[in-house]
Swiss-Prot record:
PROSITE patterns registered for this protein in UniProt: ATP_CONE
Alphabetical GO biological process terms: negative regulation of DNA-templated transcription
Gene (UniProt): nrdR
Protein name in the entry: Transcriptional repressor NrdR
Region feature Disordered, mapped onto this chain: 1-22
Residue ranges crossing the lipid bilayer per the database entry: none
Organism, scientific name: Rhizorhabdus wittichii (strain DSM 6014 / CCUG 31198 / JCM 15750 / NBRC 105917 / EY 4224 / RW1) (Sphingomonas wittichii)
unnamed zinc-finger residues: 3-34
Limits of the ATP-cone domain: 49-139
Length: 154
């Protein structure tokens, strides 16, 4: 594997173990060129998925982008990073097992919304503000009010 520091082509695996959720293998590597250490993750990919954007563009599904979006919504919230990882894994598996090779971005966003709703209400509202394209403070108020009402009812 190419070193991210010096671009040397060879590295040696020093340690290998499964992640906490068992969905990936974490490998500690050491570059044979510069001696730097870095970590890689190996994940199972059932098949290549394409996300269809609202404007019709197509992008290859990128798990890191999904995980980053969830992490941004959860920033400065008491959410364990392992739970973010598990949510991303669950969404990825749901997408991969859907039977379709293409999935609308809106469907992915809906899955994230569902997952965040169960994870953290503030993260849920943060994500919704982008996903639902809130334009004014009133949009936040209305949505947060609905979330608050649902929390009291359920």
């Amino acid at each position: 594997m190419r070193c991210p520091f010096c671009a040397h082509d060879d590295s040696q695996v020093k340690d290998s173990r499964p992640t906490d959720d068992g969905a990936a293998i974490r490998r500690r590597r050491q570059c044979e060129g510069c001696g730097a250490r870095f970590t890689t993750f190996e994940r199972i990919q059932l098949r290549e998925m394409t996300v269809v954007k609202s404007d019709g563009r197509r992008e290859v599904f990128d798990r890191s982008k999904l995980e980053r979006s969830i992490s941004v919504a959860c920033r400065k919230r008491p959410v364990d990073p392992a739970r973010i990882e598990r949510l991303a894994t669950a969404i990825q598996r749901q997408i991969e097992t859907s039977g379709d090779s293409e999935i609308p971005a809106a469907s992915v966003g809906g899955m994230v919304m569902d997952g965040l709703k169960a994870l953290d209400s503030v993260a849920y509202i943060r994500f919704a503000s982008v996903y639902k394209d809130f334009r004014e403070a009133k949009d936040f108020e209305d949505f947060a009010g609905a979330v608050s009402e649902a929390g009291r009812d359920g």
